[in-house]
Amino acid sequence: MKNAVVYIHGKGGSADEALYYKKFFNDDYEVLGFDYKSELPWQAGEEFQNYFDSLIPNYNEILLIANSIGAYFSMLSLSEKPIKKALFISPIVDMKNIILHIKIISPRFFSSP
């Protein structure tokens, strides 16, 4: 059984962008582009999970490359899926909120002098 690399584009992108990444992987990996239709996070959740559920039985391991809003939707939707590695390119996230919740920096960091 092969391994899969799934590319998820950003808004206005296309699954065809996955072709760029083929040169980075040997024949043990099938590079797939996921052309999702969702525009809102709660729509993406179901669509992304269903797509990955259809892939999981067919591959030994799945790697993920996701861009922009596709990366954001992936983080929200796929945290429980068996993805071996993920590369997020320019994900749209609320970094201030993330930093505050993991408590690595004091809230004073965000205040004006």
Locate predicted features.
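Alpha/beta-hydrolase active-site loop
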Residues: 17, 38-57
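Gly/Ala-rich beta-loop-alpha elbow adjacent to hydrolase catalytic centers
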Residues: 65-74
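Short, surface-exposed "cap/lid" segments of acyl-processing enzymes
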Residues: 1-39
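Short, glycine/serine-rich, charged loops/turns that create anion-binding
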Residues: 11-12, 69, 93
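The alpha/beta-hydrolase serine catalytic core
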Residues: 83-113
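Short coil/turn segments at beta-strand junctions that form active-site/ligand-binding loops
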Residues: 2-3, 59-62, 84
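Short glycine-/acidic-enriched loop or helix-start segments at secondary-structure transitions
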Residues: 16-18, 73-76, 97-98
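Aromatic pocket-lining residues of Rossmann-like dinucleotide-binding sites
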Residues: 77-81
